[in-house]
Amino acid sequence: GVYSADPRKVKDACLLPLLRLDEASELARLAAPVLHARTLQPVSGSEIDLQLRCSYTPDQGSTRIERVLASGTGARIVTSHDDVCLIEFQVPASQDFKLAHKEIDQILKRAQVRPLSVGVHNDRQLLQFCYTSEVADSALKILDEAGLPGELRLRQGLALVAMVGAGVTRNPLHCH
């Protein structure tokens, strides 16, 4: 099943009996080890029911994936990665920042290497793209080969903590 956090790291983590499809999709997009995006593909376009069990302790209960939009005002799940990389793209002052952001977004979409998270810093003309360490080199190569004017940097050895749940971005206690 899906827990509110990694039970090996958080002693108060609890099994979630129900997870909405959009929450499960976001968890999979964040590359959480508990759920892969391909698991959800057959579910999203059909009437298939999905029940998730923990491979370590399958008798401890399960999480059912429900096909309704999540409602609420905060995080239900905390997930993390201990080894992520940040690709930084410094847009030259002479370039249109919004246009550069749009171009890079299209390049990454076409290459199917969507980042876990994106930082957009208009004031510094800086774009940041967070990837797992397994994907970062590929994404960096794609951006480098695109030949966009600007400076690319790779920062390694970082960690990412993410919260998943309806309304996380609207809750000032859960989003900064």
Language-model features: locations:
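C-terminal catalytic "cap/lid" subdomain
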Residues: 1-176
